[in-house]
């Protein structure tokens, strides 16, 4: 072999993460066979870098590890490793293709709003309740998409599912009959309380509008009487309904009562939490009654954790009490409890779950998947939206699974 000279290659080796860039000047010799009948040519080979590459092989792993950080976009990663955003995307697509994880006996389903196009508005997220890892994300929650997806999963695997945790969206509840023959539906207790809190909040907002309309009427009367605009201070009722609605909406056990009075600029005197509570409850005769009825369900929800049989006995009396009341909000709430009675009772079942500090006993809940959905929304916001669902799916699953598998 005869040397045909040395070529200097400029190689990016982004191992420095302190703002500096490491450039390797690689001297590569080219050889030619001295046999005139052969004239075979070859370059020197280096394990550090492949042919035609301007980045070392180590950069691929560094780039992939950075893709697990949902706070970094492709542009941020490219800037960090002194390369182009197209290169880091090609590296990701080369090594990452996330497959669906096997179904476990407790899975959670929920939607996340992506709005990529008409066929991908609400994506369906499936999560392993025990580990918290996402099993898969499907580009739509519509039946024409989910039906072939679940039907293609082997029946033996689907039959192993015992609990399907979701909110009160009826298509999710129907999955049990359609696809999971041995499972029961579980309606997350958070969504039940959310429904009640939302109804109470709407009651307070409507009450606030009534007081605002009263104040506006007073202002108009003053204007018609004196012929000029007159500034009216915010009324006590509007002030309390705007600033202290949490006295009704928050669970009483979580309220922090302060004995030490503080100066209130609106009332122009010192007042503590008990004073605010007294004024707030006096705004409308229903407020105290609503709080007592709400707290009754809160206590029922707390004391029966891990005891679905006792919850099944107590919920009937609650339904009767709410439905026979004269308050429309709680009549509707009682009808809601009656409609989803069995799935709500199933939410009191407790199972062992893997957490950051090890295994612990937990109620069946959609709380973990709500946290997971937040990460998908953050990823979408950081990337200013996505057009390629498959890339978004791979990025999301790769970043949120504890031990993702690389391909290649």
Model-identified regions with their sequence ranges:
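Short, positively charged, Gly/Tyr-enriched micro-motifs
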Residues: 4-7, 11-107, 111-118, 158-161, ...
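Core catalytic machinery and nucleic-acid-binding channels of phosphodiester-processing enzymes
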Residues: 27, 79-90, 97, 130, ...
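Short, conserved catalytic/metal-binding motifs centered on acidic residues
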Residues: 33, 77, 107-112, 164-167, ...
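Short, polar/flexible loop-turn hinges at active-site or ligand-entry regions and domain interfaces
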Residues: 48-50, 159-161, 183-186, 207-212
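Acidic/histidine-rich catalytic cores and adjacent linkers
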Residues: 64, 92, 116-118, 139, ...
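RNase H-like nuclease fold core
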Residues: 90-163, 168-175
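Short secondary-structure boundary/capping segments
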Residues: 123-126, 179-183, 200-205
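Short alpha-helix plus adjacent loop in nuclease-associated cores
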Residues: 192-216
């Amino acid at each position: 072999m005869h040397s045909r000279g040395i070529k200097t290659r400029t190689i990016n080796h982004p191992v420095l993460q302190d703002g500096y860039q490491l450039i390797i000047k690689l001297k590569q010799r080219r050889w030619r066979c001295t046999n005139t009948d052969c004239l075979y040519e070859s370059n020197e080979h280096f394990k550090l870098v492949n042919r035609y590459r301007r980045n070392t092989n180590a950069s691929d792993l560094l780039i992939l590890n950075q893709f697990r950080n949902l706070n970094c976009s492709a542009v941020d990663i490219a800037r960090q490793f002194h390369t182009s955003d197209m290169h880091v995307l090609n590296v990701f697509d080369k090594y990452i293709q996330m497959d669906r994880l096997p179904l476990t006996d407790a899975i959670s389903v929920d939607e996340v709003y992506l709005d990529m196009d008409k066929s991908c508005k609400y994506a369906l997220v499936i999560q392993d309740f025990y580990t918290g890892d996402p099993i898969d994300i499907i580009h739509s929650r519509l039946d024409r998409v989910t039906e072939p997806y679940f039907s293609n999963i082997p029946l033996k695997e689907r039959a192993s599912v015992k609990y399907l945790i979701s909110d009160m969206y009826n298509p999710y509840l129907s999955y049990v009959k359609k696809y999971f023959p041995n499972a029961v539906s579980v309606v997350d207790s958070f969504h039940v309380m959310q429904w009640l809190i939302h109804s109470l909040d709407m009651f307070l907002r409507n009450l606030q509008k009534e007081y605002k309309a009263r104040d506006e009427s007073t202002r108009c009367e003053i204007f018609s009487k004196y012929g000029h605009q007159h500034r009216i201070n915010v009324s006590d009722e509007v002030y309390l309904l705007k600033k202290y609605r949490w006295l009704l909406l928050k669970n009483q056990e979580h309220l922090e009562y302060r004995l030490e009075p503080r100066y209130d600029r609106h009332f122009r005197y010192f007042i503590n939490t008990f004073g605010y509570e007294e004024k707030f409850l006096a705004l409308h005769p229903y407020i105290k009654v609503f709080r007592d009825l709400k707290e009754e369900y809160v206590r029922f929800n707390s004391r029966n954790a891990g005891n679905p049989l006792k919850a099944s006995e107590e919920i009937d009396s609650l339904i009767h009490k709410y439905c026979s009341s004269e308050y429309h909000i709680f009549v509707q709430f009682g009808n809601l409890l009656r409609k989803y009675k069995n799935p709500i009772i199933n939410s009191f079942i407790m199972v062992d779950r893997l957490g950051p500090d090890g295994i612990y006993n937990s109620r069946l809940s959609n709380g973990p998947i709500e946290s997971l959905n937040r990460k998908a929304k953050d990823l979408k916001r950081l990337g200013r939206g996505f057009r390629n669902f498959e890339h978004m799916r791979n990025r999301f699953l790769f970043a949120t699974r504890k031990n993702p598998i690389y391909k290649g």
